[in-house]
């Protein structure tokens, strides 16, 4: 949406000189080789930001000075797109100056701007009401320097008195100079957290103000490493905020949530639903699960984070009558349902993505981006998320919300550690291979895949939201790629759902056209594929590691393959356990069930979510060993187109079972080379 014809001032856009506290000296690039700082045709000369907390309203001022060093930089530098929320903020443009050959012109005129409401999270059903003041700088050429300066005045009403700011001092491209500044009153006590060796501020007092200044010149750029956890900050950065306790942060929101929950008596229809659940079962755990599903089935996710809506839940009656809401609304509704059952429940704030590091954050309302419910039952905590699709499982098997730490909105609140779930086999595959004596015929593969816990939730959602035949096609296509063979379906995919245990089993049966490949005129070879390591563990580059390695949820995975041969086969069985850092463990075994049937089992245990950077070498060694020993390959002899027994009636070992030599050597080389 655009309203370019409306007067700029009436749209929350103003034009004025920069604040007196924010000097704007002329840019001097003499002696600078800007191309040495250039990336994609742009050199960043100055990135400066300031937060002034001393006035009646908070003022955040930004200055960005960039040079166009190549044609590719023209488009990005020509765009100027400051964002603000017109409901409680004002945008003040201080200047949009183009400097060419030492001569400056100001393009920051009211008629140059269009006000656009760009809902960046529209596809996620989130509306925040922020506005972009958009302009394209005209007549921009290579060699020009663009100097943009603006302020945003005001703050979210719900967060007044709760300042916090995270800023970056080391960018992904070289920057000539970065300056960040906080101006506060001496009585405004601050807490600071510095990341990756960020410098301490220079602190000075002037005219009754305390000024904290960080200044960094040059320095190497920083590129985040792949497979680092979301909470990892490997670049120089600083978090600063008012000295507050977690209890004070909870108190900011507690009355809002309690007011929404106790919005008069519960709606009649909602109360009737809760009474019906209580009439069906007297077991508290069973009531909890039914209450959670009631919320998950009733509420459609839709977030209107406009104004205070980003922090304040709607009233219970409104939530129930509209049947939609965001995480705050879902938590209010679920807390009400559980309390009507006579249970102890409260809303709790969490951080999706960075929750594991939350206990190291400076206490601040901006430390959180999600809301769930904490249930206290029989002396333990349960963490429930009303925004998830309807979940299966009794309370013991239900997938709980796991975000590291949570802040319950109760009096005298403190952060509470969310205990990790018990180690569970979340994926178990059983394959039964039957090889015909006629080498030209297809082998038969019967496969069952059992998913548990959160993996079962994902599988169940796939089954419920698409045609089963289409889902079967997806699974078959993937298996054809893994086996490098065409498959013919023997029977349709079947689904077995154990709702209380929260497990889903998919059963498939195929004829495998090329189960074995010729390696000579009288031999065929079978090679299994890796469905354990690569789908479950990240493959990291070689060389030193700076950031932790994210392994994902704690879990176990297992594949069991049974082979039925038409002839007598023998090779030595084995059973080996491979251990890695952080408790990683893989077990690989082969055992004979009888003279013509063998079983190959591979299991992987991941008991930790993160490895430290100094464990990278041991982790690579673990991966290589599992690659080299985790698969199975064997050769079968052919005579006149038929599989035959081993020489000497099967007493002579002729079968070759090994480490999929060709495949794993390639994998090991790729791992060592960082590919």
Report residues per predicted region:
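Juxtamembrane boundary at the C-terminal end of a transmembrane helix
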Residues: 668-675
């Amino acid at each position: 949406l655009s309203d370019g014809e409306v007067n700029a001032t009436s749209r929350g856009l103003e034009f004025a000189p920069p604040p007196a506290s924010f000097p704007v000296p002329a840019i001097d690039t003499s002696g600078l080789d800007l191309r040495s700082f250039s990336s994609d045709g742009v050199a960043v000369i100055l990135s400066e930001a300031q937060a002034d907390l001393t006035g009646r309203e908070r003022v955040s001022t930004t200055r960005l000075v960039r040079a166009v060093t190549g044609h590719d930089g023209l488009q990005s530098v020509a765009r100027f797109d400051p964002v603000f929320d017109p409901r409680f903020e004002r945008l003040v443009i201080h200047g949009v100056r183009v400097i060419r050959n030492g001569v400056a012109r100001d393009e920051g005129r009211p008629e140059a701007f269009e006000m656009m409401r760009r809902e960046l999270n529209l596809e996620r059903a989130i509306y925040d009401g922020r506005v972009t003041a958009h302009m394209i700088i005209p007549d921009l050429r290579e060699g020009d320097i663009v100097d943009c300066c603006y302020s945003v005045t005001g703050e979210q009403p719900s967060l007044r008195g709760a300042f916090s700011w995270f800023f970056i001092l080391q960018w992904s491209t070289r920057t000539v100079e970065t300056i960040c500044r906080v101006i506060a009153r001496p009585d405004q006590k601050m807490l600071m957290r510095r990341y990756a060796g960020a410098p301490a501020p220079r602190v000075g007092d002037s005219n009754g103000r305390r000024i904290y200044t960080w200044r960094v010149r040059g320095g190497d750029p920083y590129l985040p490493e792949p497979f680092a956890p979301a909470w990892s900050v490997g670049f120089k950065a600083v978090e600063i905020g008012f000295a507050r306790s977690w209890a004070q942060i909870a108190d900011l929101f507690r009355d809002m949530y309690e007011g929404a929950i106790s919005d008069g008596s519960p709606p009649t229809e909602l109360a009737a639903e809760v009474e019906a659940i209580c009439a069906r079962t007297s077991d508290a755990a069973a009531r909890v699960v039914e209450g959670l599903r009631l919320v998950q089935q009733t509420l459609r996710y839709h977030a209107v984070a406009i104004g205070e809506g980003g922090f304040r839940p709607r009233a219970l009656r409104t939530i129930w009558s509209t049947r939609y809401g965001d995480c705050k609304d879902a938590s209010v509704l679920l807390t009400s349902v559980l309390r009507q059952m006579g249970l102890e429940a409260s809303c709790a704030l969490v951080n999706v993505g960075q929750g594991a590091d939350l206990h190291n954050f400076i206490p601040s309302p901006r430390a959180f981006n999600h809301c769930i419910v904490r249930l206290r039952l029989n002396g333990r905590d349960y963490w429930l998320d009303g925004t998830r699709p309807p979940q299966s499982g009794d309370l013991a098997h239900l997938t709980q919300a796991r975000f590291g730490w949570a802040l319950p909105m109760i009096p005298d609140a403190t952060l509470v550690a969310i205990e990790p779930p018990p180690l569970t086999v979340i994926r178990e595959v059983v394959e039964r291979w039957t090889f015909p004596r006629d080498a030209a015929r297809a082998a038969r593969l019967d496969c069952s895949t059992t998913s548990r816990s959160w993996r079962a939730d994902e599988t169940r959602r796939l089954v419920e939201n698409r045609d089963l035949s289409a889902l079967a096609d997806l699974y078959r296509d993937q298996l054809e790629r893994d086996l490098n063979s065409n498959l013919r379906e023997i029977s349709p995919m079947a689904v077995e759902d154990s709702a209380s245990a929260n497990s889903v089993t998919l059963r498939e049966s195929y004829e495998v056209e090329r189960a074995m490949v010729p390696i000579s005129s009288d031999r065929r070879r079978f090679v299994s594929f890796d469905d354990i390591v690569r789908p479950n563990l990240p493959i990291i580059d070689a060389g030193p590691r700076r950031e932790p390695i994210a392994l994902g949820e704690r879990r176990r995975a297992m594949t069991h393959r049974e082979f039925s041969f038409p002839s007598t086969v023998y090779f030595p069985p084995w059973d080996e356990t491979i251990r890695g850092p952080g408790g990683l463990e893989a077990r690989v075994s082969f055992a004979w069930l009888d003279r013509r049937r063998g079983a190959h089992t591979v299991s992987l245990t991941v008991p930790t979510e993160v490895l430290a950077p100094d464990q990278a070498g041991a982790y690579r060694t673990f991966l290589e060993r599992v690659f080299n020993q985790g698969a199975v390959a064997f050769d079968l002899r052919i005579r006149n187109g038929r599989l035959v027994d081993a020489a000497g009636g099967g007493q002579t070992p002729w079968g070759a079972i090994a480490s999929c030599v060709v495949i794993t050597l390639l994998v090991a080389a790729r791992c060592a080379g960082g590919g």
